[in-house]
Amino acid sequence: MRKFPLFSSSLSFLLLILFKENDIIVVMEKKKLRINMLSSSEKVAGQGVSGAYRELVRLLHRAAKDQLIVTENLPIEADVTHFHTIDFPYYLSTFQKKRSGRKIGYVHFLPATLEGSLKIPFFLKGIVKRYVFSFYNRMEHLVVVNPMFIEDLVAAGIPREKVTYIPNFVNKEKWHPLPQEEVVRLRTDLGLSDNQFIVVGAGQVQKRKGIDDFIRLAEELPQITFIWAGGFSFGGMTDGYEHYKTIMENPPKNLIFPGIVSPERMRELYALADLFLLPSYNELFPMTILEAASCEAPIMLRDLDLYKVILEGNYRATAGREEMKEAILEYQANPAVLKDLKEKAKNISREYSEEHLLQIWLDFYEKQAALGRK
């Protein structure tokens, strides 16, 4: 047998010797890539960034352990450092000389999207805008969860080739329909009959989410039960905090505000929904839509340009509160027509499944790590 020279233990691959007839096939097994995640998103409950972050990390730990070593918030060398939030210490770390590999920034929001979400003093708005774009410019590549962000980033001076769109996704083992007998029990627990029509919404309680329209619909349709899951993730900084806090403490009798709930309770609320309604005026890439779709809840949304791109008609589009009201009454009178929306929800779930997105992320990290080695 031919003898091979000894290889140093520091070599970045193994030689696997396979024999096929008289030929020797040498297959080089690449080393695992080290991806270091930097995120403070889970310090704030009840907002989508933390959910998207945890879904990605969980998926990579479970399904990519043969290709990646994933760490979180460690001061270590890595092939790729993935910044999920724009904390100031993270910003400062981009100036350090230690090898952090390729710096990837996750764009969950732009300065303009903070309008209607947080109360930012007028004199600070310019500073916040400059900081956000300065952070993004420190990155070697950006990932957007909202394809509509790309043009805004380009307008801010970031090269188009430095931006990649990769959507959010959800775990079907976590977000799934419940058995009918469980739904009946949940309705009984809430004192609701089997034929009581229920509209569920979810998200932070803030103006841009269209919460005012949700409340008005409850007032105008007292025969319908409305449930909005979510609260003030950013406390008093939330735009309209005092106004909405007062309403939540004294809502219409047919409107339930359970507050920020656990994923298990949220899954139950999706199961209760005859219709999931998100009346947002401005959205990033709402995890609640993907969660509701994975639970096979029929979905109705305000007719935003973003949804036309990412959801491709797999929902009921409405121009405003009056159309929402007409649609709710239509579905209440004829629940059978909701079957079509249920099928469309399944289409959304298939498009944004873990299986579909896993390979996209693996290919992306591989490409970025290779660029970082050049």
Curated annotation (Swiss-Prot):
Keywords: Antibiotic resistance, Carbohydrate metabolism, Cell membrane, Glycerol metabolism, Glycosyltransferase, Lipid biosynthesis, Lipid metabolism, Magnesium, Membrane, Transferase. GO terms for biological process: glycerol metabolic process; membrane lipid biosynthetic process; response to antibiotic. GO terms for cellular component: plasma membrane. It comes from the Bacteria. It is an enzyme of class 2 (transferase). The keyword Cell membrane applies. It is found in: Cell membrane. Its cofactor is Mg(2+). Pfam families: Glyco_transf_4 (PF13439), Glycos_transf_1 (PF00534). It catalyses: a 1,2-diacyl-3-O-(alpha-D-glucopyranosyl)-sn-glycerol + UDP-alpha-D-galactose = a 1,2-diacyl-3-O-[alpha-D-galactopyranosyl-(1->2)-alpha-D-glucopyranosyl]-sn-glycerol + UDP + H(+). Activated by the negatively charged lipid phosphatidylglycerol (PG). Belongs to the glycosyltransferase group 1 family. Glycosyltransferase 4 subfamily. This is Alpha-galactosylglucosyldiacylglycerol synthase. It comes from Streptococcus pneumoniae (strain ATCC BAA-255 / R6). The gene is cpoA.
